[in-house]
């Protein structure tokens, strides 16, 4: 029995499409394409102007979550700490981070796109961006941030 080559190619192509499942619909897996990211205002614990997008999990609940933050040029967060490890990947721009209870831009490390940084629990640090910057944070919730100086906390200013 002879099968024409065009018929065989068409059958293989149809079979390949029939058994291909996009990663974002596969049970137990999560995929987010850049065009599907939904940006909104960042949590109130951050100064106004930043935007956030939750890629995985829920920052308000216990468990792993992944969050993207987009900061405008000139944005900064006063010295603060977190209750658990934060794993930061710089997606675009330059993320400047310094360690200590007093912000000193001269002592900051400037991390370009593609950089990786881990912030340990309770470690006082400050961040600033001279250009628009996007970072990705992977950590465990509930997400917490405690300012070294409570007067720096934007949540206090809104009350």
Question: Positions of the model-derived regions?
Answer:
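Short acidic-glycine-tyrosine-enriched beta hairpin
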Residues: 95, 101-122
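C-terminal segment of classical bacterial N-terminal signal peptides
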Residues: 14-21
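Glycine- and acidic-residue-biased ligand/ion/polar-headgroup-sensing regions
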Residues: 72-75, 81-102
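Conserved short histidine dyad/triad with adjacent acidic residue
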Residues: 62-82, 110-112, 120-121
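Bacterial N-terminal signal peptides that target proteins for export
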Residues: 1-9
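Double-stranded beta-helix
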Residues: 28-32, 106-109, 126-159
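Short beta-strand His + acidic residue motifs that chelate non-heme Fe in jelly-roll/DSBH
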Residues: 77-79, 97-98, 119, 124-130
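A short, N-terminal "cap"/entry segment at the start of jelly-roll beta-barrel domains
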Residues: 21-65, 152-159
